[in-house]
Amino acid sequence: MMGGECKVHQLQAAGDGGPGAVAPFVAKTFHMVSDPSTNAVVRWGGAGNTFLVLDPAAFSDFLLPSYFKHRNFASFVRQLNTYGFRKVDPDRWEFAHESFLRGQAQLLPRIVRKKKKGGAAPGCRELCEEGEEVRGTIEAVQRLREEQRGMEEELQAMDQRLRAAESRPGQMMAFLAKLADEPGVVLRAMLAKKEELAAAGNNGSDPCKRRRIGADTGRGGVATGGDAAEMAQSRGTVPFPFSVLGQVFY
């Protein structure tokens, strides 16, 4: 990388903003494209009068930070446009400039920023390029913050699902403990729930049927084992999901 930096400095050695000077952005781009070790990412076109970015992701992640201190590919393309480069192929990242040719570094001073109305003050070129790099860095930070925010929201949703899954075994254990301690209460609650469902489905049930249910229960309103089995056989099993004592089980 030291040799590459020397070459970039040599391209800029003609002066700082004076005649024959090469803009820092142009010098860095020329060296980056000419480096054979990065041909898998960016290289010259076959005729040597264009250059192609073959892997925009790797270009943004590795080359841009090395040369321009940011990772924003869109900012790099914007700077190319300000120096008069044009995109020659709509289906790939291939750019050209009449003075940006392979092996023709002496032509680089001809590549200058497009002048705005009113012209530009001397020395503004470097300042504008630094502003582009700062803007690219800010956009990259904003993108990282958005990604972090999305990850935090996803983690919160996963935590809520995990808490809900952890609470279900506790609810079932509480129900089973209640069933062991007071089987009659639970059975009455189950039968009452089924009565409620039947009444909702039939817009009211037969009063005689309700009286028969009360007569079938044993002392204290608790059905005996045989009575409960007979009732379950005649009335069908308790439908699932069902709710007992305010808890819903599936």
UniProtKB/Swiss-Prot annotation:
One of its GO terms (cellular component) is nucleus. It is found in: Nucleus. Residues 199-226 are annotated as: Disordered. One of its GO terms (molecular function) is DNA-binding transcription factor activity. Residues 129-182 form a coiled coil. Keywords: Coiled coil, DNA-binding, Nucleus, Phosphoprotein, Stress response, Transcription, Transcription regulation. Disulfide bonds: none annotated. InterPro entries: HSF_DNA-bd, WH-like_DNA-bd_sf, WH_DNA-bd_sf. Its main location: nucleus. Exhibits temperature-dependent phosphorylation. Gene3D superfamilies: Winged helix-like DNA-binding domain superfamily/Winged helix DNA-binding domain. Residues 144-180 are annotated as: Hydrophobic repeat HR-A/B. It comes from the Eukaryota. One of its GO terms (biological process) is regulation of transcription by RNA polymerase II. The hydrophobic-rich region (HR-A/B) corresponds to the oligomerization domain. Transcriptional regulator that specifically binds DNA of heat shock promoter elements (HSE). Homotrimer. Belongs to the HSF family. Class C subfamily. This is Heat stress transcription factor C-1b. The gene is HSFC1B.
